[in-house]
Amino acid sequence: MIELKNIGKQFEVNGKKIIALDNVNLVVPKGTICGVIGASGAGKSTLIRCVNLLERPTVGNVIVDGQDLTTLSSQELISARRSIAMIFQHFNLLSSQTVFENVALPLRLSNTPTEHITKKVNELLELVGLTERKDVYPSNLSGGQKQRVAIARALASDPKVLLCDEATSALDPVTTQSILQLLKEINKRLGLTILLITHEMDVVKRICDRVAVIDQGKLIETGSVSEIFANPTTQLAQQFIQSTFHVELPTEYTEQFSSQPTLNSKPIIKFEFTGNSVDAPVLSMASKKFGIDFSILMSQIDYAGGVKFGFVIAEVEGDGEAITAAKCYLINNNVKVEVLGYVG
């Protein structure tokens, strides 16, 4: 449905050329949700704005539904954009118009018959759960409700593609989850292809089928969510995945940590599990094999793309050589091992 081929984008600032996108290649299959994740300034917004040519690439081709947008005339591009909707971090609603009129706006601009507008808008408001708020003005809506209005308005033209530019960044965590759930529902009910950009791996984990990691204008890793979470190949992808873990040992405990081992001290080790290593009893096997004990302090498990992943933080007791051998054994069994400190 969406194919970006060798996309490059340069800006000129004070006489200097800034490379925003560098040879980007990305395919988003029809009916899937793809998330592009990266830090601020990585090129996410530029990339998504290239899809509907709000930013025209310096080089490369943008193919949407089999049509190369970069070859179209101005009039042809206007027509093609009707099948590509977009929502933003800020909702851009008309404050002087009701919820109903905000959603109806694109239909009125395209001279849609009034009876069709009424039917279509009511259907969309039901879809986003705002039927009872249709006569309310934006100033009386919560942030989540405003984004629901923006989504309904974006769907008014029956698009095939929905672009989401940090659509949940301005929302609280609970509202974010409700908007993500709505996008997932829309994807399933309408078969809509969704491309979203975010700096939060939690967003990708919740609703995406595929993910692309962008860094300094380059896509450095792409694949299904299950593939990336099970076997991240870049350090940045690993960092984003780790950010979904909520690791916070009590301060009273961490204050006892030392960075170097001392006589009779015990290491506090974080073990990260992905893919097959989650279900394998590797800690139990290591304990028996090397004669060491694990006192679990904290653990967490989660799912992404149907794949389990998680971590265990444990105080490890045993002979130093045995602990070292156990660490090597676990690493060889696809467990990431990190010594957080020493106690005792």
UniProtKB/Swiss-Prot annotation:
This enzyme's EC code(s): 7.4.2.11
Subcellular location: Cell inner membrane
Catalysed transformations (reactions): L-methionine(out) + ATP + H2O = L-methionine(in) + ADP + phosphate + H(+); D-methionine(out) + ATP + H2O = D-methionine(in) + ADP + phosphate + H(+)
Positions with a binding annotation for ATP: G38, A39, S40, G41, A42, G43, K44, S45
Any one GO MF annotation of this record: ATP binding
Keyword Membrane attached: yes
Pfam families: ABC_tran, NIL
UniProt keyword annotations, A-Z: Amino-acid transport, ATP-binding, Cell inner membrane, Cell membrane, Membrane, Nucleotide-binding, Translocase, Transport
Cellular component annotations (GO), alphabetically ordered: Gram-negative-bacterium-type cell wall; plasma membrane
Membrane topology annotation: Peripheral membrane protein
Residue span, ABC transporter domain: 2-241
InterPro entries, per the entry: AAA+_ATPase, ABC_MetN_proteobac, ABC_transporter-like_ATP-bd, ABC_transporter-like_CS, ACT-like_dom_sf, MetN_ABC, MetN_ABC_transporter-like, NIL_domain
Domain of life assignment: Bacteria
Primary location: membrane
Function: Part of the ABC transporter complex MetNIQ involved in methionine import. Responsible for energy coupling to the transport system.
Protein family (similarity comment): Belongs to the ABC transporter superfamily. Methionine importer (TC 3.A.1.24) family.
Assembly: The complex is composed of two ATP-binding proteins (MetN), two transmembrane proteins (MetI) and a solute-binding protein (MetQ).
Protein name as annotated: Methionine import ATP-binding protein MetN
The encoding gene: metN
